[in-house]
């Protein structure tokens, strides 16, 4: 089933809609300390103004969709930090409020700007902007590296996962997000749990499933991307399916495999290609692609069938600006040396 929201949105976006880039890694670049099981959700407590600023930076560099700082924000995770269920729920709602504040501020700046922007380098353009509520995997909550392997052990069943995610999904949907973004889905078990949960709770907010891969054929657990894509295709609540937090070099092949099993829009937002050490909790130096190289893939991704394109970990507002420029003008952007 196609969603009027996503159909109309993509029609207005043109060639493809632009998704914001990395949130947690961009917060770190702004000085936030994310050495915590809550990761970027820690900033909901310590520096919400930084989250708002990063959202705004992405909007001013061409993003059409911003994603809430709730990837690793769970009621269970907040409870482990000493918060009550009610306080945890309030922090989830706050992640949506912050994104909405950034969108409102962006629209205000658009209204205040001159039509030609003069020498203003910001992209101030009145357009539909969607807020996607981020839902991270069960492995992201565990913060033990299993989000990168998809190996939860035999004791974890679909019911376990549904019960874990249920309240968070309800809160994000009730908070007024435009979309639910199920991100870095590592295995078919969790994908099926999400699909069943959306149906059981009759969630009316449209959703996308974005899987993560490290080889161009399978999700990180080893389950085939086609199997996982078929789960998304069979769920009427899911309006787009794709890949995130995966090296850019694998994306083209993954799009082609997904196109075999789904007619839904394809959503693509890879990471920079840098290697993350889940034990040391740090990114490998000089292991990724430059912004120029990242953006050079965009034409091929869109020609292969991608309808929504952005970035994940270690991509920046500059990356997103490059994507915006190549989609809006067809010209390869230039990047300043860093």
Curated annotation (Swiss-Prot):
GO MF term (any one): S-adenosylmethionine-homocysteine S-methyltransferase activity
Annotated keywords: Metal-binding, Methyltransferase, Transferase, Zinc
Binding-site residues for Zn(2+), renumbered to this chain: 245, 312-313
Superkingdom: Eukaryota
UniProt KW Chloroplast keyword: no
EC identifiers of the protein: 2.1.1.280
PROSITE patterns per UniProt: HCY
A biological process from GO: S-methylmethionine cycle
Enzyme class (EC, first level): transferase
Cited Pfam families: S-methyl_trans
Cofactor(s) required for function per UniProt: Zn(2+)
Reaction(s) catalysed (UniProt annotation): S-methyl-L-methionine + L-selenocysteine = Se-methyl-L-selenocysteine + L-methionine + H(+)
Occurrences of domain Hcy-binding (ranges): 1-327
Activity dependence on pH, as recorded: Optimum pH is 6.0.
UniProt tissue specificity: Present in all tissues tested.
NCBIfam families per the UniProt record, alphabetical: PRK09485.1 (NF007020)
Complex formation: Monomer.
Summary of the function given for this chain in its UniProt record: Catalyzes the methylation of selenocysteine with S-methylmethionine as donor. Does not methylate cysteine.
Protein name: Selenocysteine methyltransferase
Organism: Astragalus bisulcatus (Two-grooved milkvetch)
Gene name as annotated: SMTA
